Amino acid sequence: MTPHENPLGEAVDALRGGERTPIAYAKTCLERVDAVESDVHALLDEEHRAERVADDASAIEAAHEKSERKPPLYGVPVGVKDIFHVDGLPTRAGSELPPEALAGPQADAVSALLDAGAVLLGKTVTTEFAYFAPGPTRNPHNLSHTPGGSSSGSAAAVATGELPLALGSQTVGSVIRPASFCGVVGVKPSYDRVPSSGVVPLSPSADHVGYFTQDAAGARLAAEVLCTEWEPPEDEPDKPVVGVPSDVYLDQADDAMLTAFENSLDDLRTAGYEIKRTDALDTIDSVNARHNDMVAAEAALEHGPLYAAYGDRYAQGTVDLLEDGRDVPVGDLVDARNGRLDLRVALTDAMDSLGVDVWAAPAAPGPAPEGIDDTGDPVMNLPWTHAGVPTVGLPAGAVSGLPVGVQFAARFGDDERLLAWAEELEAVL
């Protein structure tokens, strides 16, 4: 399958400028859905999708028919990972649990998109409870490979061009990794920069709302709607100094991925970027263990009542997580939660002392694994999630014919500059 171009910025310009109508654009996206969904399975089935989307697009047109200035996402079709509650649609969170057991008020992030004029194209496939048990989604670049997870459907739907923007979430690596596998841009903002209310939780101390677009310009447009108190830089920031973490961390990636990463660093040097090697994350093993304990323990707490009532409907991988979480001592959970800030401070101190503006690292250990029973390893994304720092994943070539990416992480709260830099970095990669 050949991925299809459908960048957010072009859609926004055409819709707000009157070159396309929401009804016509929605029809185009629905035609793309009809063309690819039987192969990719990025969206959840919805019996009356076409009628609902047409009605919603018509309502947006009517509401703004006489408006001189259209809302920022006027008529833009969007996808929403099926852990986000949406009024009028069930939430299953990739599970076999009854929707009424998971029901809740509409997610703030969904409301932000709809208030900005977006049209919901549909819910996207997620692994069970945003953990590892996969759904049916396949990688648009090679249908025999995984799209990654847990935001499998959102990444794949953006890659296929079914829609230009989709919400996801990341508790370990569930935005940046599938973005790398599917050859799109993934954004994990600073922790809680996008509110997580109305989202089925896995580990509240690690859960981040994120999203996917086809390019960095689109990622910046979406951030202006989704991120709280967004303040774009008055002037475009200077080229960032790029820091590279320790080999102890980098060596978690495979040899082919590390070669691709070094090639990307060479491209950045050629383009005038200063690259600084550091010993940051040389204690990655303890960071990994701490984060995994925290996720397991919090998942066990969050799912306690549901698991007691519906334990026989949980996938075995999720059962194992919850059972492991029950065994995590309370003191270890407290230490893990405190460790988030410790890591954030350590990374910030290293950036300050070395004069580094962004960290660069492989966005995954390698390209998408073959098969769809395994969504890949999130280990390269884990420390940035644990620290809660803003991270953007950018496409950076291919390995073995499959997309790979580079992730860039900035200081906590420095989302605005990170996404401004991302547009320049994308042009080099």
Please report, for each region that a protein language model flagged, where it lies by residue:
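An N-terminal boundary/leader segment
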Residues: 1-54, 270-273
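Flexible, acidic active-site loops/lids enriched in D/E/S/T/G that coordinate Mg2+ and/or position polar
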Residues: 48-73, 80, 99-104, 113, ...
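Gly/Ser-rich, acidic/histidine-flanked active-site/gating loops
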Residues: 75, 208, 224-290, 397
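Conserved small-residue hinge/capping positions at short loops/turns
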Residues: 63, 69-92, 119-126, 268
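Acyltransferase
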Residues: 22-27, 58, 256-279, 304-309, ...
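Short glycine/serine-rich loop segments
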Residues: 105-223, 390-398, 403-405
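Glycine-rich, small-residue loops and helix-cap segments
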Residues: 18, 29, 75, 81, ...
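DPxDG-like acidic metal-binding loop motif
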Residues: 87-100, 160
